[in-house]
Structures are given as structure tokens and as C-alpha cells.
Amino acid sequence: MASSAQSGGSSGGPAVPTVQRGIVKMVLSGCAIIVRGQPRGGPPPERQINLSNIRAGNLARRAAATQPDAKDTPDEPWAFPAREFLRKKLIGKEVCFTIENKTPQGREYGMIYLGKDTNGENIAESLVAEGLATRREGMRANNPEQNRLSECEEQAKAAKKGMWSEGNGSHTIRDLKYTIENPRHFVDSHHQKPVNAIIEHVRDGSVVRALLLPDYYLVTVMLSGIKCPTFRREADGSETPEPFAAEAKFFTESRLLQRDVQIILESCHNQNILGTILHPNGNITELLLKEGFARCVDWSIAVYTRGAEKLRAAERFAKERRLRIWRDYVAPTANLDQKDKQFVAKVMQVLNADAIVVKLNSGDYKTIHLSSIRPPRLEGENTQDKNKKLRPLYDIPYMFEAREFLRKKLIGKKVNVTVDYIRPASPATETVPAFSERTCATVTIGGINIAEALVSKGLATVIRYRQDDDQRSSHYDELLAAEARAIKNGKGLHSKKEVPIHRVADISGDTQKAKQFLPFLQRAGRSEAVVEYVFSGSRLKLYLPKETCLITFLLAGIECPRGARNLPGLVQEGEPFSEEATLFTKELVLQREVEVEVESMDKAGNFIGWLHIDGANLSVLLVEHALSKVHFTAERSSYYKSLLSAEEAAKQKKEKVWAHYEEQPVEEVMPVLEEKERSASYKPVFVTEITDDLHFYVQDVETGTQLEKLMENMRNDIASHPPVEGSYAPRRGEFCIAKFVDGEWYRARVEKVESPAKIHVFYIDYGNREVLPSTRLGTLPPAFSTRVLPAQATEYAFAFIQVPQDDDARTDAVDSVVRDIQNTQCLLNVEHLSAGCPHVTLQFADSKGDVGLGLVKEGLVMVEVRKEKQFQKVITEYLNAQESAKSARLNLWRYGDFRADDADEFGYSR
């Protein structure tokens, strides 16, 4: 600490006190401060200076934890204003001081002046003049300092300043609150708005004690997202600093101690508050990282409201320069070329919930594991039935939901893959199986990180790493933030609700069960299915959602090359092109949603029939690509002509199974393909029902009279032969008659049987649904079945629009459509087909106005941008309408364009 000696007169005269200088580090009270020197290679020395000749009130003191009978001591009147007067005047400022007295206990008393010499402001006199301190009695009257203090005190009394004002000063006593009953509620109540505060103590570089204003809460605040070296407490009570702990503490002290700051309270951890301290001169969290005094910590970085990437960037800055705690840091070496690190690939298969199989541009297949996430796991495995074979996809809670989320988002689509790290192969241990080498990557589609989307829905968790482990996702902080949101919102794995149970019956190879299912599948016509596995080109395993069962399915009408088989004692080689046929089927249908028509079954309990994908018959496609031949059993099928035509075309190409086919060449006339144009052929329909997801059901106006006649005849028949109440036993998928609320009977289909009192039915001619007791149902007379007149309600969806994900916004759109078109005649044109239902444009019958375009104009829906050339004109019109709605801030757009930041994929909702 700097000092300068001032000489007096002769050696016999009184000694002149030595003037010393320092920087005020802390104000202990209205009459005591701590000064420090300039730092040189480490934290500087400090000393406490007590002001001579004056007395200020004592500040509040908390009772010692070791003395259970002791009580907290409150502020004395005017003690805190005196402390604040000095704090605002002196903290961080240079002062000079003289020591007049030193007690045997080492306490030093003296005079303090603001500035570099004693000509500056006398701090003791300023305190007394403001009425914040009193002159000590008993001093020599002829002492010049004492005389000046006496004058200052008289002036303060005359002006009624401070303690000399009217009243007892009780309003200056703080109501200090040392504890908070519910820290989590306290943090949430501030809604991450900055709170004014004073930093009262610095425990280490990243932990402080702060006084929150204006309510005087004294709280411990840990800086979100970082951790500085700490002071280890030894058994004898002493503290041992970790490397750079003292330097980090001084770095924070010199910038924040007893400064006015604002704190954003961000979260709560073990009764400690996590927050970010804001100061006009900068963000201490980022500064500590940048100077190499702190490291990022994963467990709290997700709550940092100013963006975790800023903290990672600051840490990288210090690592690259090997500053302080990073002096021995060695950067990981890159072992991948750029082309292998980033690439675009097509997703061919989803493996459970954390890995996918992609097809590279080279045609090779590669398994990619999603970085830093863990799929749902089975808890309490010891309680499981050891005799029961575990089926992870269905038996592990939320595994099926996670797989389905990935399947629906990714299968058949191109994704961007960024390899984050390669996990080396590991041998098996007693508790952990062996793992082969794994390529772990961040996979995005449409700018959305699939792992983050999965975590945000509570369908996966984030792996926790050692702090020095850099082998992690390049978007690790976003994953942590997504998990925090999922936990807060109780999504998926973090939900308090009962876990979903999937009772899926596997009837593959079970002849008895297959016989029971066969009639239902035959009557159902086309059934929805998901291809779970491809055994060969014509043999597949299907999951039927409505029936919740797994079946083995054989393609009808074709003879596909048989693949290699393992037989007892030998391996039977596969027929030529069997592998190509299997690969073709895999690439086309594996994990896709398809439609199947079951015709029969074989002796082994395998179902035989036709499989359709995107309107195409897989049997025909295999024949068309010369990977199968037509089987004679196809003669009885309605697809026989298509199969023969495809086979003839394949024969002419002489490829694959027809490579050695010999026939007289036939002149082939190739049709001239014309560029497809948008077809606008509007037909009159009657809108009968609008669903909550903005689909709608219509009746064809041209067949309306047939329905009216059928309904009239059916009701007359029922009136003549009424069903016996309670005699009908409903089964899912069956057609029946149901009595609607108007007391009339209508044709319906049973969708679900909860109990005899709760039967879910769908009115096939009108599109509405209802839950009825079985007493209001009856058998559908054969004379009025769907073979006589097919179901008249057809489901459609609006083309070129996206339905809002937000429940309230979607309700607004549905309400608008209900008001405009329900129970009215409109004009309908099919624009394109989809796996769910055809997408159409709908016009008002009188004005010919486009209903979907009207929704866009009102800002109730968004535009679905399609790439097909024939739709560009109408898409442009829709986009122009959307821009107009945006400009007018209508409905969805009332807060501007929300789509970039408010993606539902990440768990947000408006």
C-alpha cells in the first residue's frame, strides 16, 4: 500500500502523522472501512481503518449459528444511511489516511480524506455534518479536529439533519430477511425481471451475498452457468484455496463488492439462488470466463437467460489462449475430414429412439446416433417377469412414442448431419454390454434439431458428462434448456400421469390367433399399417394400429426370389436378385405408413394380401422393376391386369429376373408424357361436419337423393322391426345403426368399446362422432349396408394451408369455418393426395370465393408452401394474402411473425 512521510518542524516538536494511500474496498459501517493497495501479481494487502473522534450506529448482525439462544441484532437508527453515505462516496475510490491511534488489539483509528492528499474532503466531518454520526465526548477542547467536528455537529443540529431530525429514526431501520421460505416461488415471482441489489460479500469468484432492494432480502446468489475455483475448508477450520481461487475472488470483489447492481433471478438449486449480475461496466459471468477464472457448468448453464452460447464462446476464448485455469489445456484433435463431418443423407430407418439409419449420396448405409441424448429406459427391471420376453419398443414407457415421433418426422426425408464425436468401441463388462464404435451427430431437418425436439417433448433425456469431457453435442446447451422446459411442463418422461401402456399382440406365426383375426381384417377392406420389418422382398412384419397387433404379411400375386436361409446343418443360398428385392422393398416401405388388403392366410398363420404405398401396389412395383414374377394366383385378383402389364414391360427390358428371357422383339410405342398441370374440376358437395383439426366431411350432391331414399326405407324397416334393446353386442370396426340425439336412426361404425355404457361411434354418412350406450345401437340390416350404398361422408383437408398448432388459434380457425360452410353446399376440387386424406380447395357455391384463401386473408392459418410447378400460381396468391394479413397484424400475426422463435418442435407454446 502506497505511503508518503511528511516531515514536521524541529525534532523536538510533535510528530506529523504519516499520510498513506489506498483504494476503498468495503465500508463496514458508518465509521469503519477496509482499504487495499494496488494488485501486483495477485490480490493486494488490506487493512481496516476506523474513523477517529466520531461514532456511527451499528449495523444489524445475525445471531451466530453456534449460539442457539442468541438473537439477531437489528440496525441502530441511522446506521444504514451512514453506511450507504460512505459506500456511495468511497467504494472503488482512492483515499488517503493518517493513523492517529492503534489499540493493543491492533485496531487502527485515523482520519480519512477523499483524494490523494489531506486537502480532500474529510470523511468524518462530512458524516457529522450530514447528521449521520456524532462527535465522541471527552476529547481535548483545543484539538482543531475536535473543534471542526463540534462545529459540523452544531450545524447539523440547527439544520435538523439525519439523527437530529424529528422522530426517533425508526424509519431508517431495515427489516432484514435472512431466509426465504420457498426460494423456488420467490424466484418465479420475479419473472426474470432485473432486481436492484447491493453485493454485500464475495465468497468466491462465482458466489456472492446480495442485499435485494427494496425489501432487504439477504440472499446467496450463484452465477448461472459457471463455477470459479473455490476455497476448500479443512478439518481444522482453515481454508485452502484451489489454484486461482484468490485471484478469481479478487477479480469479482474489485468490480462488484458493495456496488449497485441488478440481478436476474433465474433458478433455484439446493436453496441457493442462481442468477446473472448486471453492471453498467459489463457482465461479470462472461468476464470471468473470458479471463480464464471460471469454467462453464452444464447443470446450470441452461437457465442462463442471455444465451449459453455466449458463455461457451467466452470459455473457448480463454481455452485457446490457455489463460489461468486453462494453462494446461490441450485442444482435442480433429479426426474427420470436413466432408465426413457434415453431409446430407436420406433417413431409411429409425432404431428405437436415439439412432437412425441413413443412406449417403454414395449409396452406402450408415447408422447415426443422436448426440448426447438417452432414450427412455426401463425402471425397476428386477420387478419384471423374467419369463416374459422384453419388447423394448412396446414395454419401455415412452419408447414407442419416441420412435413414432422420429419415424413420422424423418422417414424418407433428407436431413443434415453434423458429426459431433465418434464414441470408440468398448468391451463388455459384468454390468454393461459391449458397444461397437458409434458415430454421434446432430441431425436437423428444416432447421430443427431433432434431438432437441425429442428432449423438449419429454421423449428422451440428456446425458450428463464429466466437466472436462468435450465429447458431446455441439448444441448441448440447447438440449439442457429443452430438458428443463420438458421437466417444468411435465412432458413425457417427466409427467406425473400414469405411463402409457401399449398392449400389442404379436400374432406372427400363431395360427389360432391368426384365424380369429382373419375375418375382421378381410371385412375391414383397406387397413392402415406400419411396416416394422422387411424379411424379404415379399415378406414383411406389419403393425396394425387399429387392431394393436403385429402380423406377418406376404405379398399376394407375385413370386419373389427367395433369400438365403439358415437350415439345420447348412446354409441355403438365396436365389438371384433376392437381396436386390429385399433392398427395394426396404427402401420403399420400411417404417412407412401403408394400406393393406388381407385376402387369406397360409398354414403358418401368415396373412396374404396386397400392400399399397402412396397409392401404388407394392406387388406391381416389384414386378415392374423385374424383381418378381406374376404368380398364377393373381388371376382371381382385380390387380391381375396391372401385374401382367408390368411384367410385359419388365420382360422387354431383359433385366434382373428377366435377364435371360427370350422373345421376339415387339415394337414398343412410348407414350408422350405431358407436363402435369393443375386440374380444376370443381364438383358440388354438401359440408356436413368440421373436425377440431380443420378436416371436414362432405356428401356428394349427386348421390344425395340415393342417401335420402335409403334412410327413409331403413327407418321404415326399423320401425316395423325395431331392434331389441341391449341385444346388440358392439365390436370395434363393425357397421351398425345408432340412434342420434334427434331420435332418428343412422348408419354408423363402432370405433371403440370402453364399456356397455360408452361406445364410440362414427356416423358414416355425415362424419360426426358420438359416445352412446349400447342400448342405442343395433345391427345394420343387410339391405342398407355399405355394399348397397357406400358411406356417403368423405373426409378432406384444406390444401395449401397449415393449421395452427396452438389450441386457441386452431379453435378460432375451426369456428370461422363452421360459421361459413357447415351444412351448406360448396364446390370442391381435389388438388393432391396424402396418406391421411385428399387435400382440396373449397369454394362458396354462390360467390366462388376460395374458403382456404379466406382463412389466410384473415390471418387464421398459415400457407403450406409446395414445390410442384402446377401449384405455383395459387401458392403465390396464398402467400400474397398471408403477407397482407401479417401487415395488418390479424389474428396469428398480431404479435408479428412468431414462427422462427416459437416452434412447437421445441416445446414452446404461445
From Swiss-Prot:
GO molecular function per UniProt: endonuclease activity, active with either ribo- or deoxyribonucleic acids and producing 3'-phosphomonoesters; RNA binding
Chain location of the short sequence motif Nuclear localization signal per the record: 321-325, 388-392
Cellular localization per UniProt: Cytoplasm; Nucleus; Melanosome
Keywords: Acetylation, Cytoplasm, Endonuclease, Hydrolase, Isopeptide bond, Nuclease, Nucleus, Phosphoprotein, Repeat, Transcription, Transcription regulation, Ubl conjugation
BP terms from Gene Ontology: mRNA catabolic process; regulatory ncRNA-mediated gene silencing
CDD domains: SNc (cd00175), Tudor_TDRD11 (cd20433)
Entry EC no(s): 3.1.31.1
InterPro entries cross-referenced by the UniProt entry: Silence_cplx_Nase-comp_TudorSN, SNase_OB-fold_sf, Staphylococal_nuclease_OB-fold, Thermonucl_AS, Tudor, Tudor_TDRD11
Broad enzyme group: hydrolase
Description of how the protein assembles with itself and partners: Forms a ternary complex with STAT6 and POLR2A. Associates with the RNA-induced silencing complex (RISC). Interacts with the RISC components AGO2, FMR1 and TNRC6A. Interacts with GTF2E1 and GTF2E2. Interacts with PIM1. Interacts with STAT5. Interacts with SYT11 (via C2 2 domain); the interaction with SYT11 is direct.
Functional note: Endonuclease that mediates miRNA decay of both protein-free and AGO2-loaded miRNAs. As part of its function in miRNA decay, regulates mRNAs involved in G1-to-S phase transition. Functions as a bridging factor between STAT6 and the basal transcription factor. Plays a role in PIM1 regulation of MYB activity. Functions as a transcriptional coactivator for STAT5.
Protein name (database record): Staphylococcal nuclease domain-containing protein 1
Gene: SND1
